[in-house]
Each structure stands twice: as structure tokens, then as C-alpha cells.
Amino acid sequence: MDFKDYYKILGVEASADEKAIKAAYRKLARKYHPDVSKERDAEDKFKEANEAYEVLGDKDKRAEYDEIRKYGGQHGRPFQAPPGWQSRGGNGGGGGFEGGDFSDFFSSIFGARGGNPFGGGGGRQQRSAGRRGQDVELELAVFLEETLNKESKQISFQVPQTNGAGQRTGFTTKTLNVKIPAGVTDGERIRLKGQGAPGVGGGANGDLFLTIRMAPHPLFDVEGHDLIITVPLAPWEAALGAKVAVPTLTGKINLTIRPDSQSGQRLRVKGMGLLNKQGERGDLYAQLKVVMPAQSDAAARELWTQLSEKAAFNPRTQWSK
């Protein structure tokens, strides 16, 4: 069994406070989330970050871990808990955003916990008959196109399982079809009642909480419910005007570029943005950007020379005032 340096996994110092630990975890969770990352080992890194936050995000588990860390464990090196080591117990539970399988190292430290071998996991269970199931937190990556899609998005996540005594026995994978609400924004938290862990002894199921993370788009920037797209133009298109095919979330449109258009100018396309809470769409703004050719042949340079001689234009006239 190898030692796991949870501080190193999250990339924080051992003196890091709760806020820094949570921020580091969220950054890694977004980076390696299976719905977002294309890296081959993303799932393993995601689970590793989740396990680290399960420990460091809870003061009781962190205190136990810090105590055993004093025995000189090094990340990735063989490790064995000291003789007679026994978990100090406690309700605990950093409440990592998504459940997952924990390592042998985790189990060797926290698996002997009386009453609930893995702690409360951030749930709201009570120590009485008919206990409510644990809530589950999950970050959900949403693409801009999906906010306009009327179809449901299928998600899979891990739900903790318990026995009749309320002791954690493992995890099971649950799959749901989720409708993305109109007007959803980055960081918004959505509650799905009763979709968390099952209750114990007839208790109610926990809830599933989805924290929305809008995935970056290669073409569009977001400003509220409006979209911004940069439209490259050749110098002659800006000077003479043109019809340009511009992408939107639902297909291309033909945008009219008026003669003598300026770089940086924004053209508004009404109703082609994102949905708001009322189901109305914002606007699309096409920001013009004049782009020079990378290379010019002799004939093209001759035309530029003729233009420079005939055009009575100085873009720096304001400097002479």
C-alpha cells in the first residue's frame, strides 16, 4: 500500500486553510471531470482529487491524517499504519462533490471508524431510526448548445450505499436524465429532490445537488445572456462591404457587413443569444476584426502602393492636434 500525500495531490501547503483547499479541489475537479477532460488518466486524477478533498475538507479527518502524516509517509512510497493505530471516529465528511471508490490507503486510516466506517460524507443523517439518506454533490459540465436543447442530458454519478445499521458499505452508480433549466448560469446550484443516497430504516432519500459549470466555447464568449463572436474580415471586405456566413449556436446566418466598417465595431443580431429564466433569448454580438494577409505577392503590394498614394487617409491625425 502506497502513502498518499493529499496536500500534494491538491497542490496546497499543509498550512492551507479551508478556503484554499476547497478552491484547489474545485479547480482540479473542473480540469479532470470526465465530462470535460480528454486526458487518458482524467478519471483517475478526478477520483484522487475527490479522495484528497474528502479528507482535507473535513476538520476531523484532516486532524487524523495530519497525525499519521507525522510518521514520515512520502507520496507514492510504501506505507503501513503504525501498530495499534485506530481511527478516532467522528461524524466527519468533507462532502467531496462526487462520490467515488476510495484507495486502500484511505480505508486503512478511516475504515475502522465505529458506527460509520467512512464518516458522514457531508450528509444530513441523524443517529435514529428512519434516517434520511446522504445528499450528493456533483459538478455538471454544460455546453452552450445544451442550454438551448430541449432534450435531456444523461448523467452518471456515484451514490453511497449503507446497511441497515447505517454503516457505509460502498458505492453504486446511478444514471439520470436531467433537463437543463432555461437561463442556467455558471455556478448555479440545482436541487433534484430524492435523487441522492437512499434512506435507512424507511427514511427519506437524500437530494442530488448539481453545480453548473459552463464549458468554455471555442467561438463564443458569454456576457450575461448575450454571446460575443469575433468575425475576421479582409481589409477589402471592411472597406467595400460583404456578406459573411457567421456561426451561431443553431447554425450559420448571413451577416451584412456595411462598407467602411471599422475593426472593433459590434453588430447586434437580436434573439440569437442564450435563454434567460423567462425563456427569452439574449442577443448575439458580432465583433469585427480586420485581418491583414500573412503574405502579399508583388502584384498585391503594387495595389497597396497605389491605394496608399491615392487615399487621403491618415489614421493618426488626432496626434497632430
Curated annotation (Swiss-Prot):
This is Curved DNA-binding protein. Pfam families: DnaJ (PF00226), DnaJ_C (PF01556). One of its GO terms (biological process) is protein refolding. Residues 5-69 form the J domain. It is found in: Cytoplasm, Nucleoid. Signal peptide: none annotated. SMART domains: DnaJ. The keyword Zinc does not apply. DNA-binding protein that preferentially recognizes a curved DNA sequence. It is probably a functional analog of DnaJ; displays overlapping activities with DnaJ, but functions under different conditions, probably acting as a molecular chaperone in an adaptive response to environmental stresses other than heat shock. Lacks autonomous chaperone activity; binds native substrates and targets them for recognition by DnaK. Its activity is inhibited by the binding of CbpM. It comes from Pseudomonas entomophila (strain L48). SUPFAM superfamilies: Chaperone J-domain (SSF46565), HSP40/DnaJ peptide-binding domain (SSF49493). GO terms for molecular function: bent DNA binding; unfolded protein binding. InterPro entries: DNA-bd_curved-DNA, DnaJ_C, DnaJ_domain, DnaJ_domain_CS, HSP40/DnaJ_pept-bd, J_dom_sf. Residues 87-97 have a biased composition (Gly residues). Its main location: cytoplasm. Keywords: Chaperone, Cytoplasm, DNA-binding. Residues 74-97 are annotated as: Disordered. GO terms for cellular component: cytoplasm; nucleoid. It comes from the Bacteria.
